[in-house]
Amino acid sequence: NLTEFPRPILRKICVDPFDPSDPCSIMLSLSFSLWRYHSCFVISRKNNHNYFLLGKTYFASDFHLGVDGRLSSAERERQLVRWLETIRHDADAIYLVGDIFDFWFEYKTAVPRGYVRLLGKLAELRDAGVVLHLFTGNHDMWMFDYLQKELDTPIYREPVIHKIGDKTFFIGHGDGLGPGDHGYKLLKKVFANRLCQWLFARLHPNFGIGLANFFSNKSREANHSEDVFLGPDKEWLLQYSTRKSEQMPKVDYFIFGHRHLPINYLLPNCYTRYINLGEWVHFNSYAVFDGQELKLAFFEHPEGKAVEG
């Protein structure tokens, strides 16, 4: 029974790529083919290899490190490290779905200072075999290849579809999706333009990062009522998920961040769920999938509550 193996050995077996020239690898692959029908597994692709994963999959977004909230940014970072430490015993995949930082820009030879505790913990988890998926958000879309190389992890700039166990997940940060918000959609194209990125890189980091933080704070002040559920007719990511579910009926979960409100909502097809991960500035919310069911949960925030529908 493979579930009786020590977990570090299982993780090593599952993370190593399949080698068709290795008889041991072939035997393990056949064993897993029989066993996976009786346990949770994930198949993901990296560098054209198939990986088998065991255990739980975690999703979180919108840490917005660099700005204070219910806790200071430094205290929130330590809290995130505690959360990662508590889930490391059963986490085989972690999706960080955008806006990890309130602002991030990678110069050719410099990155924003700070965040060493979080980055160190993520590196530790990667070295232990935990699969990590990073997404850019609207606050850290200028994340290039630094974290990709240092953490040996993919960075997604658009939504992706991943199969986890026997469930299909549509995952993305959520910015620029759905109806309306044409001003931001235009601005996003400007920010994604290579010429604009080159021009910003010409600014001294002290000035460029300070300017970006100023506009980030202004944007937050203009969206201070984000924690109010607007109803299915006005929640644009819910509307987007509803339309997408009609085009992609095999998707079980649409998972987004960006909205800053934990939401678990059943779509009109009575099968697919729209999940918003909330944020960590106030809610400390995240989602966990155990192979059968996905739930929203709260870390060190017992009064946290999600919008259910």
Language-model features, listed with the residues they occupy:
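Active-site-proximal loop/helix segment associated with metal-binding centers of metalloenzymes
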Residues: G174-W236
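Short, low-complexity, charge-dense intrinsically disordered segments
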Residues: N1-I9, C14-K46
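Conserved beta-sheet core of the metallophosphoesterase superfamily
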Residues: E150, P154-R157, F170, D175, ...
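Conserved catalytic motifs of the protein kinase core domain
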Residues: K56, A93, K167, D252, ...
